[in-house]
From Swiss-Prot:
GO terms for cellular component: P-body. GO terms for biological process: deadenylation-independent decapping of nuclear-transcribed mRNA; P-body assembly. This is NAD(P)H-hydrate epimerase. Belongs to the NnrE/AIBP family. It is an enzyme of class 5 (isomerase). Its cofactor is K(+). K(+) binds at N58, D119, T155. (6S)-NADPHX binds at N57, N58, G59, A60, D61, G123, T124, G125, L126, N127, N128, L129, D152. GO terms for molecular function: metal ion binding; mRNA binding; NAD(P)HX epimerase activity; nucleotide binding.
Length: 223
């Protein structure tokens, strides 16, 4: 199976949206539906689902996932990590939709009440240390050992190197899109990603694209 770096994944995303013409919202909906499939096929405690959403496309996926769960009657809460007014347009569009469903996002949620946490804070675009406040929140969540499903990559994991950017949310399952990421197969990233499930959401590679690595060259114990 082919592996990609964060920058290679960005090239694939850009090509699919800008050259092929696939709307970003279509990819977001497909990503969200694929996560719903994973949740439905797994043996997760769905009594109270908490979705933690960031301000970028990963957060937009999280909002769409929240909407789909809410529409199916699940007890789901949506909490943003960061100032929503600074969120990308993709997030704002998803928010406008979910508000019409009547769901009110939470300003602050109690991790202890959640039986399942959806990590949609940062995906493959993370290239800096996480803010100190977010690091503290992640460490608190890890301490109480809640079941976490990470969207694309666990927050805090460098998708290229597998290194931790200050702190990382430990996932039971990671649903990643298009292709697996090198950082989910090596170093700490391989351990913190849990069970990695790759979902096809319709991303296309440019004609001149070449994969930098394959999964056979890595393992989760690679240090």
């Amino acid at each position: 199976m082919q592996l990609v770096t964060a920058s290679e994944m960005q090239k694939i995303d850009t090509y699919t949206v800008n050259t092929i013409g696939m709307p970003q919202d279509v990819l977001i909906e497909r990503a969200a539906l694929s996560v719903i499939d994973v949740i439905g096929a797994g043996h997760f405690n769905l009594e109270h689902i908490l979705v933690l959403a960031g301000l970028g496309n990963n957060g937009a996926d999280g909002v769409a996932i929240t909407r789909l769960l809410y529409a199916q009657g699940f007890n789901v809460s949506l909490q943003f990590v960061g100032n929503v007014s600074r969120a990308k347009e993709s997030v704002q569009r998803q928010l406008a939709i979910i508000e019409k469903y009547g769901l009110v996002r939470s300003e602050k949620s109690d991790f202890n009440e959640a039986t399942l946490i959806i990590d949609a804070i940062f995906g493959t675009g993370l290239n800096n240390l996480l803010p100190e406040g977010l690091q503290k929140m992640i460490k608190a969540a890890n301490h109480i050992e809640k079941t976490v499903i990470a969207i694309d990559t666990p927050t805090g994991i460098d998708a290229t190197t597998g290194e931790v950017r200050g702190a990382a949310l430990k996932a039971h399952t990671t649903v990643t899109f298009g292709y697996n990421k090198i950082g989910l197969t090596r170093r700490v990233g391989g351990y913190l990603s849990g069970n990695v499930i790759v979902k096809d959401i319709g991303l296309l590679t440019p004609p001149d694209f070449s994969f930098s690595d394959t999964e056979e060259n890595h393992s989760t114990k690679d240090v």
